[in-house]
Amino acid sequence: MNINTAYFAGGCFWCMTKPFDTFDGIEKVTSGYMGGHIENPTYEQVKSGTSGHLETVEIQYDVALFSYNKLLEIFFSVIDPLDTGGQYQDRGPQYQTAIFYTNDHQKELAETYIEQLKNTINADKAIATKILPASQFYKAEDYHQDFYKKNPERYAEEQKIRQEYKNKQ
């Protein structure tokens, strides 16, 4: 097995886990924080919007079974890449979108994907999703891990609200 790691910030990490977690070739999806200026941030620090971190998922995947481009497709299917203020009902800098690359190949694939996306969407706004070098990933508290499995009713409600928000746009 050849395991690689990818990092995506797509708003609330509760809503970002399941879309990736359900595919063969995805070994593990971990909720956490990346991009800020505080070591070992807590959820409360990140939630306040002052730590500089984005809620992020770390995805460990088998490159023989799953491509980075497929990860990009999934990521962009569940976010609004034009939203500068967060994602859907989740507002604030900690919910902004970003692709954190771990090597030049991931960076190039992300840049190419966004260029293609620009050509396919009809929008007056620029793509808000940033492409940034990966930095220290801090695993979120245990109660955030596998949220959709531990709290299916609350997860379903979050997804319903998110879908209603999408439909209004």
UniProtKB/Swiss-Prot annotation:
GO cellular component, one term: cytoplasm
InterPro entries: Met_Sox_Rdtase_MsrA_dom, Met_Sox_Rdtase_MsrA_sf
Active-site residues per Swiss-Prot or TrEMBL entry: C12
EC numbers on record: 1.8.4.11
GO MF assignments: L-methionine-(S)-S-oxide reductase activity; peptide-methionine (S)-S-oxide reductase activity
UniProt cross-references to Pfam families, sorted A to Z: PMSR
Annotated GO biological process: cellular response to oxidative stress; protein modification process
S-S pairs: none
Family per similarity comment: Belongs to the MsrA Met sulfoxide reductase family.
UniProt function note: Has an important function as a repair enzyme for proteins that have been inactivated by oxidation. Catalyzes the reversible oxidation-reduction of methionine sulfoxide in proteins to methionine.
Name of this chain's protein: Peptide methionine sulfoxide reductase MsrA 1
Organism: Staphylococcus aureus (strain NCTC 8325 / PS 47)
Name of the encoding gene: msrA1
